[in-house]
Amino acid sequence: AVCILHHLKSVALLPSALSRCLSGSSFNIPPSAEFVARPSGICSMMKLPVQTSTEGLDAAFIGIPLDIGTSNRPGARFGPRHIRAESAMLRRYNPSTGAAPFDSLLVADVGDVNVNLYNLPDSCQRIRGHYAEIVASGCVPLTLGGDHTITYPILQAVAKKHGPVGLVHVDAHTDTSAAALGEPIYHGTPFRRCVDEGLLDCRRVVQIGLRGSSYAPDAYQYSREQGFRVVLAEECWLKSLVPLMEEVREQMGDKPIYISFDIDGLDPAYAPGTGTPEIAGLTPTQALEIIRGCKGLNIVGCDLVEVAPVYDVSGNTALLGANLLFEMLCVLPKVKTL
């Protein structure tokens, strides 16, 4: 400890290594601002170590800076970078729930998938291959998007190991379109493609926060026909979602599930930095209730998508995204509660 403290001012010392040494922990720990200035160091998720492989990790943060699947406002390619920057405010423990993820899991930031910004099918292939290796290693991926197209190749990799998975999907939109401008892959089709390929256990899919105008009288017909549970935003207004999540936990059982959280599920008053905003959405409090309500489920992966920082000069949308990813980490199966 004396040696470490002697080198506190050295830029060569990794902040997370400092925290690990000072605490005597064998896990990676987000550094305390008592010892390391928040604006300093490499911009990684929660200032965790950056490594190129998930070998030995229990969970990892991965960025996918892709937005060529967007249909309205672009900019989600910058989501991972801004989420990481805002995550410097996050700390080691979650006092509200007692979760101690960094006393339970070995976690690191493994950088970004090298996507092809000029070819969406090629990007999907790259994502699928990258995640196949991550999932095969036994590591749970927590993904920083990127537009919602990315969930399709991620679930291809996840289902290859776990079989059809349950899904907790928070979004303003169903993302079950058949195609757009003749293209079957974009951010409005990921879950249609997942159904087509048998990647989802449709009896264990719930979509929460859906709203907005539509091109058809019943915008949710396809989802209901597949057996998805559809929870409209109007059903969530002015109420706690704790009772809903009790029902969701019963529905999901103990089989593998995936959490996909589109930031536009939240009302744009809280999260304006997104590409396809819809009014009258969920609140940050309800977002916490949804994620915390997944505690005890067999979560095999998570993503937080559609943060487009250019539309939010305050940085609050990216800050929300960073906090929600931390909350997802806190409900992973092996996380201890103090």
Give each language-model segment a name.
Residues H169-A172, Q207-G212, L232-E234, E306:
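Short, structured patches in soluble enzyme cores that scaffold and shape functional sites
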Residues V2-L66, N72-L142, T149-T151, A157-H162, ...:
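Catalytic cores of soluble, metal-dependent hydrolases
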